[in-house]
Amino acid sequence: MATPHINAQPGDFAETVLMPGDPLRAKYIAETFLEDVKQVCDVRNMFGFTGTYKGKKVSVMGHGMGIPSACIYVHELIAEYGVKNVIRVGSCGAVRDDVNLMDVVIGMGASTDSKVNRIRFNDHDFAALADYGLLEEAVKQARAQNVPVKVGNVFSADLFYTPEADIFEKMEKLGILGVDMEAAGIYGVAADLKAKALTILTVSDHIIRGEKLSSEDRQKSFNDMMKVALETAINL
């Protein structure tokens, strides 16, 4: 049965869904990496696809930009379509000095300036964590493919253009690896609905050093990350 934001039918989604922010990136993943692909939803042009990877059923769907958008799609996938594993695949801006362009960052935990998880938890702090089984498998797959990987805390920002000029230095001091805009919200939804979630990010720029990937290196880095995510998805 369709939801307000997803017009797929029951059974259209695999138990594991890979979720980039950009719906066109979801289309790229489906067309590049999956076989026997079927488009299962297109409401608001937020495309979703299901196919197979090495013979195993996998789905991919965009979640939009920011915690509110991501939470809507993740909630509906889990609550209405029976999805059990959500793996966000995206990019981040690095802040810690030992994190480099093209590294893969896996968000073991996610800090945030959003109140979304405080709203869930009677205004208390909530430790937004990845599922350990997903995390362990992703690290294993990254190392098997010789992809440089860092595991630790990320920061999910509500504002892309932040007015807090000193926040990145404080993040670095606290050991935060990089900044995205969704992980903390996704982890909160998964915890609330008793599902599993993980965030895998490729480092597209270094905020403090002012470094950025070229378009060619950005694509290669994304493809490397996707192979890690897909191998994780089929080995759960």
From Swiss-Prot:
Keyword match Ligase: no
One Pfam family of this chain: PNP_UDP_1
Keywords from the UniProt entry: Glycosyltransferase, Transferase
EC number assigned by the record: 2.4.2.1
Enzyme class: transferase
Active-site residue list: 205 (proton donor)
CDD domains: PNP_EcPNPI-like (cd09006)
Site for Important for catalytic activity, residues: 218
Record's keyword annotation contains Glycosyltransferase: yes
Binding residues annotated for phosphate, in chain numbering: 21, 25, 44, 88-91
Gene Ontology biological-process entries: purine nucleoside catabolic process
InterPro entries for the chain: DeoD-type, Nucleoside_phosphorylase_d, Nucleoside_phosphorylase_sf
A GO-annotated cellular component: cytosol
Gene Ontology MF annotations: purine-nucleoside phosphorylase activity
Binding locations of a purine D-ribonucleoside: 5, 180-182, 204-205
Catalytic reaction equation(s): a purine D-ribonucleoside + phosphate = a purine nucleobase + alpha-D-ribose 1-phosphate; a purine 2'-deoxy-D-ribonucleoside + phosphate = a purine nucleobase + 2-deoxy-alpha-D-ribose 1-phosphate
Family classification: Belongs to the PNP/UDP phosphorylase family.
UniProt cross-references to PANTHER family, sorted A to Z: FI09636P-RELATED, URIDINE PHOSPHORYLASE
Quaternary organization: Homohexamer; trimer of homodimers.
Function field: Catalyzes the reversible phosphorolytic breakdown of the N-glycosidic bond in the beta-(deoxy)ribonucleoside molecules, with the formation of the corresponding free purine bases and pentose-1-phosphate.
Protein known as: Purine nucleoside phosphorylase DeoD-type 2
Species, as recorded: Vibrio vulnificus (strain YJ016)
Taxonomic classification: Bacteria, Pseudomonadati, Pseudomonadota, Gammaproteobacteria, Vibrionales
Gene: deoD2
